[in-house]
UniProtKB/Swiss-Prot annotation:
HAMAP family: NusB. GO terms for molecular function: RNA binding. The keyword RNA-binding applies. Involved in transcription antitermination. Required for transcription of ribosomal RNA (rRNA) genes. Binds specifically to the boxA antiterminator sequence of the ribosomal RNA (rrn) operons. One of its GO terms (biological process) is transcription antitermination. It comes from Xanthomonas oryzae pv. oryzae (strain KACC10331 / KXO85). Pfam families: NusB. Keywords: RNA-binding, Transcription, Transcription antitermination, Transcription regulation. Disulfide bonds: none annotated. InterPro entries: NusB-like_sf, NusB_fam, NusB_RsmB_TIM44. This is Transcription antitermination protein NusB. Belongs to the NusB family. One of its GO terms (cellular component) is cytosol. Gene3D superfamilies: NusB-like (1.10.940.10).
Length: 156
């Protein structure tokens, strides 16, 4: 739906609804977490959550891109995150690990998403689902990583 003047109902010219993107990120977190815990096959995890997501209004294409991206590039994401962690990737709490992998994927592979949006969404997701101080850890890791990964955008 559009507002008068031809802009999408959410007021963004690029057609992206930030609310739907946030929901897609939350569902992607749940899918990545389930995959980490179960060790299931990527396609099965995506199919299960995509089916469930069809009933929830969210950006399904973005959800699928995030989950596939993390599952396909897990080794590269973990390698990229390692210099910014104070412990091994597998030692990070499972929720925070999933949040960090999703955010790393967006920072490294989704240059169309501003780094501040990625970090803020990761912090809010960690607050909602993670441990008591997990969001602080996520913030510190991603702030340091973004300076390197998005040098031009962050002004470093």
């Amino acid at each position: 739906m559009s507002k008068p003047g031809g802009h999408p109902r959410h007021g963004r010219r690029d057609g992206i609804d930030p609310v739907l993107r946030s929901r897609a990120r939350r569902r992607a977190l749940q899918a990545v977490y389930a995959w980490q815990i179960s060790g299931g096959f990527a396609k099965q995890v995506i199919a299960q959550f995509a089916h469930e997501q069809a009933h929830e209004v969210a950006d399904l294409a973005y959800f699928e891109n995030l989950v596939e991206g993390v599952l396909t590039n897990r080794a590269e994401l973990d390698t990229a995150l390692t210099p910014y962690l104070d412990r091994g990737v597998e030692e990070v709490d499972a929720i925070e690990r999933a949040v960090l992998r999703l955010a790393a994927y967006e920072l490294l592979y989704r240059q169309d998403v501003p780094y501040r949006v990625v970090i803020n969404e990761a912090i809010e997701t960690a607050k909602r689902f993670g441990s008591e101080h997990g969001h602080t850890y996520v913030n510190g890791v991603l702030d340091r990583a973004a300076v390197e990964w998005r040098k031009v955008e962050s002004g470093a």
